[in-house]
Amino acid sequence: MRSPGIVLLLLLLLLLPPGAAPCPADLCPAPPRVNVSLDAAPAARWLPVLRLFDPGLLRAAVARIVGDRVPKWRDVIGKLVAEMESFLPQPYTKEIRGISDFLNLSLADGFIVNLAYEASAFCTSVVAQDSRGHIYHGRNLDYPFGDLLRKMTVDVQFLKNGQIAFTGTTFIGYVGLWTGQSPYKFTVSGDERDKGWWWENMIAALFQGHSPVSWLIRTTLSESEDFEASVYKLAKTPLIADVYYIVGGTAPGEGVVVTRNRGGPADIWPLDPLNGAWFRVETNYDHWKPVPKSDDRRTPAIKALNATGQANLSLEALFQVLSVVPVCNKITVYTTVMSAATPDKYMTRIRNLS
């Protein structure tokens, strides 16, 4: 008799185009896992991690991303950042200052590259509940420049008083988080909501005190005490850009997709397992609208989840769902699966289909 794992793998294989197969997690490399002490001064807390990486690689990544993603009038942004540094959100601006000084970059370029990441994160996120009421959360992060970013991806354990306060996955030099977990409380991921990117509006909102979307994830992981509090903070805090926040908790039913406008929530889409809605899939499109045929990652993910079945759901099964092409694609940088109820099982793997 075949084991449930073998049956699941065979079912997923049927969903794939020729030549595309799930990648077992143990065959995909894990990123470095590093510690960042929040008890250290903001300007110094990333320095031990930075010393583990080639500074030339990091400077090259900044130059490439800024050159490709940032408007030609970035000099104007640089002047604004220099003049308004003391008014920008903390501790993040001080952290960027410390990183920039270490890499011999201007604060403006360090700041701009952090904002550039906010604009281009294409993603797939899934929050789901198994038949026993356990909550699982997974995400793929897709981004151009994968040749650089795969070398810069890290799992970060943020420490307070020597203990893990929360965990997140990010790129070296980027102080925000698109993926994270507060142990025994909640998990969260962010997916870009593309409403047309206007740097002018983003900068204006920033100087009005609105939060970058990835900084709010990190703040929420640091400050919110439970699933409900995290959803409220993620739904209500003014932002510099639209986004989808996907949140998973520890109790049955604790899973939601929050569709955000800059000023507040556009939609709240919770799990509804009693009525058969045991998972939610969010890519980069409003869930109540059809996805464009040119970028349909939603349908393959839904098919893979239904093929898996609620009774067979696990972190490994969710990893396989996120391995189905085109959910996993040539610009997928990493996959993370997590469950706040079992925080030690937080797992990230680097993907490289190119």
Swiss-Prot record:
> Under what name is this protein listed?
N-acylethanolamine-hydrolyzing acid amidase
Q: Which domain of life is it from?
A: Eukaryota
One GO cellular component this record assigns the protein to is: membrane
What gene name does this entry carry? NAAA
What's the source species for this entry? Cavia porcellus (Guinea pig)
According to the record, the signal peptide region is 1-22
Its quaternary organisation is: Heterodimer of an alpha and a beta subunit, produced by autocatalytic cleavage.
Q: Which CDD domains match?
A: Ntn_AC_NAAA
Keyword list (alphabetical) reads: Autocatalytic cleavage, Fatty acid metabolism, Glycoprotein, Hydrolase, Lipid degradation, Lipid metabolism, Lysosome, Membrane, Signal, Zymogen
What is this enzyme's EC?
Answer: 3.5.1.60, 3.5.1.23
Top EC group: hydrolase
Site (Important for enzyme activity) residue list: R139, N284
Q: What is this entry's stated membrane topology?
A: Peripheral membrane protein
What this protein is reported to do is described as: Degrades bioactive fatty acid amides to their corresponding acids, with the following preference: N-palmitoylethanolamine > N-myristoylethanolamine > N-stearoylethanolamine > N-oleoylethanolamine > N-linoleoylethanolamine > N-arachidonoylethanolamine.
Report a single Gene Ontology molecular function: fatty acid amide hydrolase activity
Could you tell me what reaction this enzyme catalyses?
N-hexadecanoylethanolamine + H2O = ethanolamine + hexadecanoate; an N-(long-chain fatty acyl)ethanolamine + H2O = a long-chain fatty acid + ethanolamine; N-dodecanoylethanolamine + H2O = dodecanoate + ethanolamine; N-tetradecanoylethanolamine + H2O = tetradecanoate + ethanolamine
What does the entry's PTM section describe? N-glycosylated. Tunicamycin treatment causes a reduction in specific activity against N-palmitoylethanolamine.
Q: Does the keyword Glycoprotein apply?
A: yes
What InterPro entries is this protein classified in?
Acid_ceramidase-like, Acid_ceramidase_N
Glycosylated residues, per the record, are N35, N104, N306, N312, N352
GO term, biological process aspect, one: lipid catabolic process
